[in-house]
């Protein structure tokens, strides 16, 4: 698949186009231009490093939404084996914006749950662009409770603009469904490892992300509202989204500094979409490291650790002027 370049990546796109042009010419030319191709490839790589070393929060938000970025099912195929998808909330419907099921991780049985956005127009509509309704969160809760019953660790993958804000979702208890999930996750007797792989949008993300370990991919985002939504409220125009992204502090490094996430998983040069298999390999290694720390831990210890972790959010110390 041909790489889609974002606006700020246009200098890279121009170099890559030139490289492709030379490769096409080389196939029909007696002149060896491989040295020039190698030189331009090196220049493109260095330019990518320079651009990605100085990204603004708004540019990170664009990468998190990249249409070719790996989604939950892409990681399921690369990281897990024997995946068996489970459907429905046993109350209303099967929300396809959330996928989940039983699988094996390095041979160990587990439960996998995550948002799924869709690649083309038809699938995006089918998946509701990754915006879940109450039945989606209730499906996730059902799978968490099933994993808890059989002592299976849970892996969740977050990638949503936010919970679906439609009238039908509100009528069926959107806030109750999200709140009930928070309650269930807080009391699980098994470890839950949450990974924000793309967009982490508000309560729609939090509904499957109250984990014993919360990690983010390097160019993922996690915030209470989208930059455009924030800008529309504060400045009455979505054009202020770059300023809003800066104010929201939605990047992995900012959230790690605040203690809101535990780990940052590095992405391949140019983002996860440039090397999906490489990204899956790095993520699998990180998940294995996270799961390992819970081996031999009793349920009481696990729940006490989780409680302490959750109660630490928002803590601060007041320091007055010395007399």
UniProtKB/Swiss-Prot annotation:
GO CC list: acetyl-CoA carboxylase complex
Reactions this protein catalyses: N(6)-carboxybiotinyl-L-lysyl-[protein] + acetyl-CoA = N(6)-biotinyl-L-lysyl-[protein] + malonyl-CoA
This protein's record includes keyword Cytoplasm: yes
Domain of life according to the entry: Bacteria
Example of a GO MF term: acetyl-CoA carboxylase activity
EC number(s) on file: 2.1.3.15
Cellular localization per UniProt: Cytoplasm
Pathway(s) per entry: Lipid metabolism; malonyl-CoA biosynthesis; malonyl-CoA from acetyl-CoA: step 1/1
Any single biological process term in GO: malonyl-CoA biosynthetic process
Keywords of the record: ATP-binding, Cytoplasm, Fatty acid biosynthesis, Fatty acid metabolism, Lipid biosynthesis, Lipid metabolism, Nucleotide-binding, Transferase
Lipid metabolism as UniProt keyword: yes
SUPFAM superfamilies: ClpP/crotonase
Top enzyme class: transferase
Every CoA carboxyltransferase C-terminal domain range: 39-293
Family that this chain belongs to: Belongs to the AccA family.
PANTHER family in alphabetical order: ACETYL-COENZYME A CARBOXYLASE CARBOXYL TRANSFERASE SUBUNIT ALPHA, ACETYL-COENZYME A CARBOXYLASE CARBOXYL TRANSFERASE SUBUNIT ALPHA, CHLOROPLASTIC
Subunit structure and binding partners: Acetyl-CoA carboxylase is a heterohexamer composed of biotin carboxyl carrier protein (AccB), biotin carboxylase (AccC) and two subunits each of ACCase subunit alpha (AccA) and ACCase subunit beta (AccD).
Known role: Component of the acetyl coenzyme A carboxylase (ACC) complex. First, biotin carboxylase catalyzes the carboxylation of biotin on its carrier protein (BCCP) and then the CO(2) group is transferred by the carboxyltransferase to acetyl-CoA to form malonyl-CoA.
UniProt protein name: Acetyl-coenzyme A carboxylase carboxyl transferase subunit alpha
Species: Cupriavidus metallidurans (strain ATCC 43123 / DSM 2839 / NBRC 102507 / CH34) (Ralstonia metallidurans)
């Amino acid at each position: 698949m041909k790489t889609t370049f974002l606006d700020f990546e246009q200098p890279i796109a121009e170099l890559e186009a030139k490289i492709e042009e030379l490769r096409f010419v080389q196939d029909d030319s007696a002149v060896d231009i491989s040295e020039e191709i190698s030189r331009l490839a090196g220049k493109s790589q260095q330019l990518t490093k320079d651009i990605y070393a100085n990204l603004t929060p708004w540019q990170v938000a664009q990468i998190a939404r990249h249409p070719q970025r790996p989604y939950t099912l892409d990681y399921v195929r690369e990281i897990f084996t024997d995946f068996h998808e489970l459907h429905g909330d046993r109350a209303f419907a099967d929300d396809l914006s959330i996928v989940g099921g039983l699988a094996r991780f390095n041979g160990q049985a587990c439960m996998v749950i995550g948002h799924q956005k869709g690649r083309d127009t038809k699938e995006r509509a089918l998946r509701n662009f990754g915006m879940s309704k109450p039945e989606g969160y209730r499906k996730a809760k059902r799978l968490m409770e099933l994993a808890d019953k059989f002592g299976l660790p849970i892996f969740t993958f977050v990638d949503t603009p936010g919970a679906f804000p439609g009238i039908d979702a509100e009528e069926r208890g959107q806030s109750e469904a999200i709140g009930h999930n928070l309650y269930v996750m807080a009391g699980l007797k098994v470890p839950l490892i949450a990974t924000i792989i793309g967009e982490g949008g508000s309560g729609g993300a939090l509904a499957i992300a109250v984990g014993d370990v919360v990690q983010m991919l390097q160019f993922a985002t996690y915030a209470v509202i989208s930059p455009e939504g924030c800008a529309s409220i504060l400045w009455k125009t979505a054009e202020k989204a770059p300023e809003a992204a800066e104010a929201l502090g939605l990047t992995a490094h900012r959230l790690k500094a605040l203690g809101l996430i535990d780990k940052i998983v590095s992405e391949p040069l140019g983002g996860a979409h440039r090397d999906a298999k490489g990204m899956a390999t790095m993520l699998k290694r990180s998940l294995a490291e996270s799961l390992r720390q819970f081996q031999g831990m009793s349920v009481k210890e696990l729940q006490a650790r989780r409680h302490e972790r959750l109660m630490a959010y928002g803590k601060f110390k007041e320091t007055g002027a010395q007399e």
